[in-house]
Amino acid sequence: MQRRIMGIETEFGVTCTFHGHRRLSPDEVARYLFRRVVSWGRSSNVFLRNGARLYLDVGSHPEYATAECDSLVQLVTHDRAGEWVLEDLLVDAEQRLADEGIGGDIYLFKNNTDSAGNSYGCHENYLIVRAGEFSRISDVLLPFLVTRQLICGAGKVLQTPKAATFCLSQRAEHIWEGVSSATTRSRPIINTRDEPHADAEKYRRLHVIVGDSNMCETTTMLKVGTASLVLEMIEAGVPFRDFSLDNPIRAIREVSHDVTGRRPVRLAGGRQASALDIQREYYSRAVEHLQTREPNAQVEQVVDLWGRQLDAVESQDFAKVDTEIDWVIKRKLFQRYQDRYNMELSDPKIAQLDLAYHDIKRGRGVFDLLQRKGLATRVTTDEEIADAVDNPPQTTRARLRGEFISAAQAAGRDFTVDWVHLKLNDQAQRTVLCKDPFRAVDERVKRLIASM
């Protein structure tokens, strides 16, 4: 499948610092954030005009699920649009707090752990054909996903009883299973719950919950681009060396704790391989695969960055990727800070900087400041993100959903939507079922809109 439907769900961390005496719990802060959403959507679980879903998840975490996208840059743009949508709610909620005499600054973090050790996720969704053998997909994909943090981790300072250490991934410490149907209790790498949001006879949705939330656009593109390409190669029957891991849960932590990528991890049957070895195998197969697949500039850009990042890890010279990979950008920032102020990695100011990197408020968040200085590479523009805040992708089913929502809101009609249904809540209860996520034009939807 060279044209694949993809989406990203991001849970955001939320906190608030108060100027006055009154304090609010995280639940109350989240309710302030969603008050405007509830006022027009009558719920804290809504679909937006751009086709995305916005809701309050378990544990007061705002969650944004992008609309269905069918290209990498489109997905990165809509992922960034989610940050802007949440930032808009943040500004509105701060104004409400001020109006009610509760002065406070609200912070939304696009990260994966809070100071109490709780974890929240970034979930990737990839459409795959039902006909394939799912066990082969998971067998080949698992070693790739365990070691993928080497190229696209968000980076984190982990405080251990011995010392502070820099890790590649925020999520690695919180993963407890390889393949499972749970998402919160045991946190697997691949979630098997079968909800295709499409024609179930044709498709299933691969739900990957091991990845970090990325701030840098090129890192997000690398994360989803490499995974989608590995899936494409599996579907095409490309042979891979067997890197079945003896213990994926131990391996994911070992990889995260080693920025050199050279630490050997145990494979099934007693063999060993390093994260670098494993990633090199998938990368070299991808380079070969590019010779036979349809040319695609975005996919070629991904493979180029993949190779340059592996070279950088191998040589430990990151100069050629230090504006493109989150954990490399962050580590360089910490090192400069430590040198300038003569401080240890365990200094609380570094932990503060670690958190501030993920602050999504423009003009305040550290990553945003780096990006403005040209220290983080982009694949999209502010104009494209602003457009994605208001408009759905034009090449997928999301267009139908977005146009239906916009028309119903403009006509003042009561409606219900989810990923596959568009329904007018009138006497006739007219409903259109959109089972094909690739279909951006549908006469039935046009007629439903015309009837409003």
Swiss-Prot record:
Residue numbers binding Mg(2+): 9, 55, 63
> Which catalysed reactions does the entry list for this protein?
ATP + [prokaryotic ubiquitin-like protein]-L-glutamate + [protein]-L-lysine = ADP + phosphate + N(6)-([prokaryotic ubiquitin-like protein]-gamma-L-glutamyl)-[protein]-L-lysine
Q: Catalytic site residues?
A: 57 (proton acceptor)
One annotated GO biological process: modification-dependent protein catabolic process
Pathway membership:
Protein degradation; proteasomal Pup-dependent pathway; Protein modification; protein pupylation
Mind listing the GO molecular function terms for this protein? Answer: ATP binding; ligase activity, forming carbon-nitrogen bonds; magnesium ion binding; ubiquitin-like protein transferase activity
The EC number on file is: 6.3.1.19
Show the InterPro entries listed in the entry. Answer: Pup_ligase, Pup_ligase/deamidase
Protein's UniProt keywords contain Membrane: no
Enumerate the UniProt keywords alphabetically. ATP-binding, Ligase, Magnesium, Metal-binding, Nucleotide-binding, Ubl conjugation pathway
Its biological purpose: Catalyzes the covalent attachment of the prokaryotic ubiquitin-like protein modifier Pup to the proteasomal substrate proteins, thereby targeting them for proteasomal degradation. This tagging system is termed pupylation. The ligation reaction involves the side-chain carboxylate of the C-terminal glutamate of Pup and the side-chain amino group of a substrate lysine.
Family the entry assigns: Belongs to the Pup ligase/Pup deamidase family. Pup-conjugating enzyme subfamily.
Official protein name in the record: Pup--protein ligase
Native source species: Mycobacterium ulcerans (strain Agy99)
Read off the lineage from the record. Bacteria, Bacillati, Actinomycetota, Actinomycetes, Mycobacteriales
